[in-house]
């Protein structure tokens, strides 16, 4: 930080930050709700302990960092750089004010007062339904995404729309065909810029499984960023802060490492949202891993009513990673209520088992994300999350505690007791929460308002609101 801030500002910033912390603590203690402190993450917009002071400090330091970096590089944001359309930043500034106003005026006893012919967010599955609704409507009204046209399929502008990486392919194809309605052909009017490469397709077509040279990612992605940064002014103007990439591949985070500004500055939208692998929820956005085996999106949802669900908990899956071996060691085919299998026995159907279970166990494998989480929600089965360092999808908006159960690795031996001890009243609230949240995890073609694809866009929108560019 000292490299970016002149010495004469250190004392001022220290005093200002101290005041901000004190102010936030006062506000938090005075609140009837949680006393947690939230810095400039997107989740701060939805929590009642929100402190505008922290946002102000963060924005000031971010803008100051841009200015100082350019001065040291012999350039000036007002000279030799493309001048950003003032309307773009003015729109974002207006959105910030309106969203904060909605957050501060929120009452837990009311839903959003805003009109909406399709859906009005309400209930405790949201951190703040009013602020979310206000933000979503503003996004629909003003958010514009520019998709760089450079690059050819199948590496760029294209992705596979089936199997475990289907979400990456579907998003690329929807953006390419402007199905989501946020794309602009005028880059000067854009709020964010999309780098339309597919990590899955790079590895599928260019990666040699024998040689296993991961440098192919570096060559493709670094070359692409170099091309667009020379042809257009937008990357250099913002240092990549208003650019984003999206990947559901396990190596999605690795793919960004080879371009440091992409790794540290840009919005990385990843299924594998692992904090231990430098996923930064202040700027990066998690989204769900959904396994569309054949690409068919019909009949994804279903399930019995709570009274007819005869199985307490269910899991079937291979033993890999650090968590699953622990689960299988303790529970594999050892209990009539906790049904855990490494290989599903003949005569049992995976989907039907989820649809008749009260709880679906969702342990991380090699990577933190698991397609079992959306599968459980589709089945009306309360997810039991067993993971470490995993940032849950859309957790800046959704309150996962209201429709899932979290169990730590050390609590795996006590899994049955934990689930049996959940009162029926609480289980019913969790079950109803799963039914409500399904709308936001569901895959639709074409996409529908508030579905998983629009929620991904909303996550990107929130990250863009966290950055102020001059």
Swiss-Prot record:
Keyword Membrane annotated: yes
Lumenal-side segments: 29-470
Record's subcellular location: Golgi apparatus membrane
Its membrane topology: Single-pass type II membrane protein
Gene Ontology MF terms: glycosyltransferase activity
Cytoplasmic side: 1-7
Top enzyme category: transferase
Main location: Golgi
Residues spanning the membrane: 8-28
Record EC number: 2.4.-.-
Superkingdom: Eukaryota
CC terms in the record's Gene Ontology section: Golgi membrane
Family classification: Belongs to the glycosyltransferase 47 family.
Protein task: May be involved in cell wall biosynthesis.
Name the record gives this protein: Probable glycosyltransferase At3g07620
Annotated organism of origin: Arabidopsis thaliana
């Amino acid at each position: 930080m000292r490299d970016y801030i002149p010495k004469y500002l250190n004392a001022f910033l220290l005093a200002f930050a101290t005041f901000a912390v004190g102010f936030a603590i006062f506000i938090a203690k005075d609140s009837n709700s949680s006393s947690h402190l939230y810095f400039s993450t997107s989740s701060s917009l939805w929590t009642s302990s929100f402190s505008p002071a922290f946002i102000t400090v963060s924005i000031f330091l971010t803008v100051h960092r841009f200015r100082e970096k350019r001065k040291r590089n012999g350039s000036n944001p007002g000279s030799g750089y493309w001048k950003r359309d003032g309307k773009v930043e003015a729109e974002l500034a207006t959105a910030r004010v309106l969203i904060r106003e909605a957050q501060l005026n929120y009452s837990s006893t009311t839903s959003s007062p805003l009109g909406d012919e399709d859906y009005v967010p309400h209930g405790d599955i949201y951190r703040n339904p009013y602020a979310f609704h206000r933000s979503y409507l503003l996004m629909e009204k003003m958010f514009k995404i520019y998709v760089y046209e450079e690059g050819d399929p199948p590496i760029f502008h294209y992705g596979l729309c089936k199997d475990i990486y289907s979400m990456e392919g579907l998003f690329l194809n929807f953006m390419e065909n402007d199905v989501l309605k946020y794309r602009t052909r005028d880059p000067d009017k854009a709020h964010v810029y999309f780098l339309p490469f597919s990590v899955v397709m790079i590895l599928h077509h260019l990666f040699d499984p024998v040689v296993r040279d991961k440098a192919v990612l570096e060559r493709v992605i670094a070359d692409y960023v170099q091309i667009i940064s020379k042809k257009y002014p937008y990357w250099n103007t913002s240092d990549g802060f208003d650019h984003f990439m999206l990947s559901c591949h396990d190596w999605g985070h690795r793919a960004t490492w080879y371009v440091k500004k992409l790794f540290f500055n840009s919005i990385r939208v990843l299924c594998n949202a692992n904090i231990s692998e430098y996923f930064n929820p202040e700027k990066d956005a998690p989204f769900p891993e959904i396994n569309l085996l054949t690409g068919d999106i019909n009949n994804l949802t279903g399930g019995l009513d709570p009274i007819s669900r005869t199985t307490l908990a269910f899991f079937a899956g291979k033993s890999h990673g650090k968590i699953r071996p622990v689960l299988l060691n303790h529970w594999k085919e050892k209990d009539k209520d906790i049904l855990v299998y490494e290989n599903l026995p003949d005569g049992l159907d995976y989907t039907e088992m989820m649809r008749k279970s009260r709880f679906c166990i969702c342990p991380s494998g090699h990577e933190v994300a698991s397609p079992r989480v959306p599968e459980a929600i589709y089945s009306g089965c309360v997810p039991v999350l067993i993971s470490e360092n995993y940032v849950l999808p859309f957790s800046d908006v959704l309150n996962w505690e209201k429709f899932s159960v979290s169990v730590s690795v050390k609590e795996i031996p006590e899994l049955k007791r934990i689930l049996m001890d959940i009162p029926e009243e609480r289980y019913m609230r969790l079950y109803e929460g799963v039914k409500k949240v399904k709308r936001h995890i569901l895959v639709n073609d074409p996409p529908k308002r508030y579905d998983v694809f629009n929620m991904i866009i909303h996550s990107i929108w929130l990250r863009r609101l966290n950055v102020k560019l001059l």
